[in-house]
């Protein structure tokens, strides 16, 4: 079967201008206009199904390119028309839809598929059928954004839009190269599968699906409808936060996160934005997980989640990372992953210069500078920059914690949190620091730790200028200035600035201590306290001061120590104006003004302002001295006493007086010494009113009265 050669195809554009350039017209006869002289139908080349299948990829590409060029030339000559105007000739009613495979001598069953359901006449072209049905139903789904006029076909809308754009048919593209690049979407081995082309070339290139025609189906039933977007362009944008969506149906659900509209309420507890969410929530209460994966046995509450999970077993992984061997289904995910190894960070913040490996992380980071928090909790008024953090926070109020640890009984709102917690019991630490070799049980703790080495502290307090390595630390710190304490203990009424501190405090009332040291059998209410305690036995001190070389077991202790060098005291007491280097010392100090002593010894009835003081005191009754000096073997009831004692051996005097330069081994001794310079006398005798600079001097004086 003879096929047109590339030379024949490439010569087609010349046919358009041929009559105007080479034809001689009789004298006195009317010269035909360009409009009547040539139409796209005159220069189009059609193939049968058999002919099309014989073309290779290069020939198909050439055919597609030439047809596009012909269409562009016809359009520029004004020969491309829809049937909106009266009296339009059927041959002029041609748009990109004619780039279809024509079926010569179609059988009657095929022709029947092309008849109008309303009045029955057969129409030769599927394009004509769509327009004819439009006249019957009066449905015009395509609207011009400039003037509001409605059209039956997307192609006619684009033709009309040329009136606004000055007759430039390719106005959606900056140049011809961009058009041809976009048209490659349609150049696959099977060119009849794409139902969306309006975003790629001039009109809807609704190419025929030949198999459906042969089987008697109606492949054109949706031709007059606006197709779903099949590109990566996100058309529907939220006016509140700028987030964009592919589907219009997704936007209303997202908008509910900004408004107070919560249309679905669970009778057991909790409010939901979508109906499917409340159905899923009911399965939390009933414990129903009916969908089980046959491959690995993992169970799911929704069939959709099971199907999504099964793709990990069945899908072919096309993209493999040569660095670590990990495979991916999608190219974009693969590209993002490769940046972990290459260190590439192409997205840079204009405000602070920090770079990110993908755009979503940059958008999230930019909210740190703008202070934008569009997601507000209706229960406590707390606002969040991300919807994921907002949804996670809501579980604090609903108390939905379906994931329980079989080891200690602790429950969690997320399965990932349970997996992370389980590593406390197993001792697993899969995330290792490449700088110092220290290992962590989760990736976020590793990322947090690495900032110790880099010194990166990108989050700055606008109130006092203090900077932090994490946004969560900045938010916690900002509550020092605002005095905000939204989390209240239902047992004693005490309020806290964050939920984690409240949860930690509640264990005082319950006495719960699920974390036990395998070395000395001491138990703790928090896993972090157990990890901290474990370093007493191992002697591990991974945090070193770059100024003096001193090492510490905890990063928080290093930060506190660093203020000895910087003289920084960011925490101010609202009662007396005194400044402190640590928030914990400020809280401890504030109890001097309030007289609050919530911790009572069950043995002797003595009250204490701090839990740690009660624990230290309790050892007076038990005689326990768990902290032993490695130099001389002397034992102490508290770690602080051991640290203080060790300075006798090391001769360390970290607390220096800025007035006279004298150094001291203990901070309390420095504070006492500074009163010599300030002449401050804060201790008053209740008997005679005499003032003293030191408490010990007051105690000595009181003996005169007794």
Swiss-Prot record:
One Pfam family, short name: KRAB
Annotated compartments: Nucleus
Keyword Transcription: yes
Domain KRAB: 38-121
GO biological process assignments: regulation of transcription by RNA polymerase II
Zinc finger extent (C2H2-type): 114-136, 142-164, 236-258, 291-313, 319-341, 347-369, 375-397, 403-425, 431-453, 459-481, 487-509, 515-537, 543-565, 571-593, 599-621, 627-649, 655-677, 683-705
Record-linked SMART domains: KRAB, ZnF_C2H2
Cellular component terms (Gene Ontology): nucleus
Keyword Nucleus: yes
Keywords attached to this entry: DNA-binding, Metal-binding, Nucleus, Repeat, Transcription, Transcription regulation, Zinc, Zinc-finger
MF (Gene Ontology): DNA-binding transcription factor activity, RNA polymerase II-specific; RNA polymerase II cis-regulatory region sequence-specific DNA binding; zinc ion binding
Family from the record: Belongs to the krueppel C2H2-type zinc-finger protein family.
UniProt function note: May be involved in transcriptional regulation.
PANTHER family in alphabetical order: PROTEIN ESCARGOT, ZINC FINGER PROTEIN
Name of the protein: Zinc finger protein 132
Organism: Homo sapiens
